[in-house]
Regions:
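Short acidic, gly/pro-rich beta-turn/loop elements at beta-sheet edges
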Residues: 109, 162, 238, 261, ...
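Substrate-binding cleft of extracellular glycoside hydrolase catalytic domains
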Residues: 84, 89-213, 219-221
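Catalytic domains of cell-wall/extracellular-matrix polysaccharide-remodeling enzymes
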Residues: 182-264
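Secretory targeting and sorting signals
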Residues: 1-35
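Flexible, glycine-rich phosphate/dinucleotide-binding loops
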Residues: 130, 159, 235, 258, ...
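Functionally critical loop-and-helix segments that line ligand-binding/catalytic clefts
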Residues: 37-105, 242-296
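Short alpha-helical interface patches
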Residues: 4-7, 110-115, 191, 205, ...
Length: 296
């Protein structure tokens, strides 16, 4: 996306009088209008909608597109139960409920989700080096003020710029980390290419190098290793490297269990177990271990 186009989109977004492309999830969202800088024509609003649809992809959107969502009320209930992995037999005795959001949720009613037992959230901050979530401040700061342990995530497009460039952009636009006990390390969202070839036209070795570039740059800038979000099917098709010794795994699988994990991870830290009515997650441990992840 050109600089002029990005500037035009930013100006249009700042002038919106209603949330754009927000999902109306009953009590889970608020349709609170931001103060209008100037009225927009229908043509301008449509241009913003088109741009968001072309340049903004929520976490798991491409996994759901390719792999489907087989979650049911029964599988969602099962996801809330401890599921110790072979690497940690009988050691996981608790879980913590969480969620992740993007611009599609608009202004989120954090009190509602808190009352439903959610205690952590990651919100989308960036995609590539051209997109920032226009609702990021409300989602990131609003959840924090409600009491959530919160973090930010970056939707990767490995064919558009280097891992270092995208990590730098992410940190500069909300993806940093602070040792306040309530901020999670940033998450790197690695999933199917929404624009074309599954692995973005990269070999497994090249994709591994790209992820390492992001992973190392993020660590250099924040002192934390990023959480890696992915599905086992995508990872095993596109990546050959091993990040299990540094990066906590956030696995996506919309079924009754997290299933087989990506290469060499012995257990998952977070499991995204459904995308309905929005992305919901479970932390694999007790609340004090979630706090430990935030504290580093």
């Amino acid at each position: 996306m050109s600089t002029s186009r990005r500037g035009r989109r930013t100006a249009l977004l700042s002038a919106l009088t209603v949330p754009v492309v927000a999902l109306l999830l009953g009590a889970s969202t608020e349709a609170t209008a931001a103060p209008a800088a100037s009225p927009l024509s229908a043509r301008e609003i449509n241009a913003v909608n088109t741009d968001i649809q072309a340049n903004n992809h929520a976490m798991g959107s491409q996994i759901r597109r390719v792999e489907g969502d087989q979650s049911t009320p029964e599988t969602k209930a099962a996801a809330q139960q401890p599921q110790p992995a072979a690497a940690l037999p009988n050691q996981v005795a608790a879980t913590v409920a969480g969620m992740d959001v993007a611009s599609y949720q608009g202004n989120v009613n954090w009190g509602n989700w808190w009352s439903q037992g959610k205690r952590f959230v990651w919100t989308k901050a960036t995609e590539s080096t051209s997109y920032t979530n226009p609702y990021f401040a409300q989602q990131y700061n609003g959840s924090y003020n409600q009491g959530f342990i919160r973090g930010a995530y970056h939707f990767a497009t490995p064919n558009t710029s280097s891992g270092a460039a995208q990590a730098t952009y992410f940190v500069a636009h909300g993806g940093g980390w602070s040792a306040d006990g309530k901020t999670l390390p940033g998450a790197l969202d690695m999933e199917y290419n929404p624009y074309g070839a599954t692995c973005y036209g990269l070999s497994k070795a090249s994709m591994t190098a790209w992820i390492k570039d992001f992973h190392d740059t993020y660590h250099a800038k924040t002192g934390r290793w990023p959480v890696i979000y992915t599905s086992t099917n995508w990872w095993n098709q596109c990546v050959s490297g091993d990040f299990s010794s540094t990066a906590p795994l956030w696995v996506a699988r919309y079924a009754s269990s997290a299933g087989t994990l990506p290469y060499n991870w012995g257990y998952y830290t977070v499991w995204q177990y459904t995308s309905s009515p929005l992305d919901q997650d479970t932390f694999n441990g007790a609340y004090d271990r979630l706090q430990a992840l935030a504290n580093g």
